[in-house]
């Protein structure tokens, strides 16, 4: 199994990229997966008092690494692309348990275009979306400006994704990995123009 990691910004074309990649029979690119959280919390538990009382480093490494192996055990493709926007902020976890040479694919788009895409989607859908539900729980008024502020503030989907990506650069973790940015603009160009 060769693992790659899709950590694209929301509304930046990662679903389109996934659909394109899945046309190759040797690649499986899935939707958002729980693999990161499974590995992160397993690693966290193994650093706590009970595990450290009688440490078993090799067993601990196997426990955490097995999360990604087991999650994709139903797949036969040699290239597996796990999707989670948190990966850039936790490259150390990838290096420790998956590969010394992680490859991250990140679809990117201008933040204002991301927000505009969300707002368009919300209006087109016409139902109560996850942003509106969260805002109502916090007693916020549902306006497009408030939605944008909510998504761009800490805890918001756009801010969290951009912060995870920025963390990789702040911690200088991108120097020793393959970081593949994919621009939404280039991804959506008409095929005849991009060839």
Show the residue positions of the predicted features.
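PAPS-dependent sulfotransferase catalytic core
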Residues: 1-75
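Conserved phosphate-donor/acceptor-positioning beta-strand/loop module used by diverse small-molecule
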Residues: 98-118
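Single conserved hydrophobic/aromatic residue that forms the stacking wall/gate
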Residues: 186-195
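Histidine-centered beta-alpha loop that forms part of the nucleotide-sugar donor binding/catalytic region
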Residues: 32, 85, 109-110
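Glycine-rich phosphate-binding loop used to anchor ATP phosphates in small-molecule kinases
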Residues: 71-90
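Short beta-strand segments
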Residues: 6-8, 80-83, 106-108, 179-182
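A short acidic, amphipathic alpha-helical/loop segment
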Residues: 90-96
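PAPS-dependent sulfotransferase catalytic domain
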Residues: 61-74, 116-187
């Amino acid at each position: 199994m060769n693992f790659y990691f899709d950590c694209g910004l929301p509304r930046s074309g990662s679903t389109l990229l996934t659909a394109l990649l899945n046309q190759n029979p040797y690649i499986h690119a899935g939707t958002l997966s729980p693999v990161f959280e499974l590995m992160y919390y397993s690693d966290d538990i193994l650093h706590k008092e009970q595990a450290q009382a009688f440490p078993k480093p090799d067993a601990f490494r196997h426990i955490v690494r097995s999360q990604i192996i087991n999650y994709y055990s139903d797949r036969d493709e040699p290239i597996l692309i796990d999707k989670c926007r948190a990966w850039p902020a936790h490259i150390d976890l990838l290096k420790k348990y998956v590969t010394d040479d992680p490859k991250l694919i990140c679809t990117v788009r201008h933040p204002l275009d991301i927000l505009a895409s969300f707002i368009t989607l919300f209006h087109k859908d016409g139902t109560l979306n996850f942003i509106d539900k969260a805002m109502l729980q916090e007693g916020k008024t549902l306006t497009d400006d408030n939605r944008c502020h909510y998504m761009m503030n800490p805890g918001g989907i756009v801010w969290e994704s951009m912060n995870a990506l920025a963390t990789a650069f702040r911690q200088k973790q991108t120097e020793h990995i393959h970081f593949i940015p994919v621009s939404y603009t280039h991804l959506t160009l008409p095929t005849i123009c991009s060839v």
